[in-house]
Amino acid sequence: MIKHVLLFFVFISFSVSANDFFRADSRTPDEIRRAGGLLPRGQQEAYERGTPININLYEHARGTVTGNTRYNDGYVSTTVTLRQAHLIGQNILGSYNEYYIYVVAPAPNLFDVNGVLGRYSPYPSENEFAALGGIPLSQIIGWYRVSFGAIEGGMQRNRDYRGDLFRGLTVAPNEDGYQLAGFPSNFPAWREMPWSTFAPEQCVPNNKEFKGGVCISATNVLSKYDLMNFKKLLKRRLALTFFMSEDDFIGVHGERDEL
């Protein structure tokens, strides 16, 4: 939960869209670039220790008892404004002399935590949008540097951002997220609208084979399927961009040579 802190917030001009998202993070842009993006903690644990990634929105939103990210978390948190990301950064990363606020383009890998979890969202004031499977480097528009609690200068553009891939995309509709909510076994939400309509079969309370572990496993399978579809979408857009660029080249330089 966010603690209220008193901040001296300086108004600065920045070229971001009202639809963009923001994440405070201790990792530097070079670290993010080497990693290929803002990856979830669970992915690193899976690589280093073979720990299965838990792609469960409800458990992600709850975090651990201490308020930290779960070791096997399959989501990356963002919020809706630069100011809110700054507040979260000061609360979580205030002990750092320096951290960064990354600006993220909207896309269907982002889920509205409050919209999907409704009244069961544990920290609604955070206005979180969670990125399923993390945020690829090509989705990061740029970043702000925060030094000793103050945002310094304007946004630095990410040279690896692919506006052609993300232009016109929007976040996932809540209807796509209800089945990924990941509520625990016998949780009342599974008997309520809208979740009861979208509940995976293994999560329906009146199912004779209903078990918490089976429900969680089903949620992970569905989440991975959604992530796979998002990656396919980017690949299709990348291919379309390539062919459009090739057509432009042919239009200027004449017909393409046949091999």
Curated annotation (Swiss-Prot):
Keywords: Disulfide bond, Enterotoxin, Signal, Toxin, Virulence. GO terms for cellular component: extracellular space. The keyword Signal applies. NAD(+) binds at residues 23-37. GO terms for molecular function: toxin activity. The active site is at 128. The keyword Signal applies. Residues 1-18 form the signal peptide. It comes from the Bacteria. Pfam families: Enterotoxin_a (PF01375). Disulfide bonds join 203-215. Belongs to the enterotoxin A family. The biological activity of the toxin is produced by the A chain, which activates intracellular adenyl cyclase. Heterohexamer of one A chain and of five B chains. This is Heat-labile enterotoxin IIA, A chain. It comes from Escherichia coli.
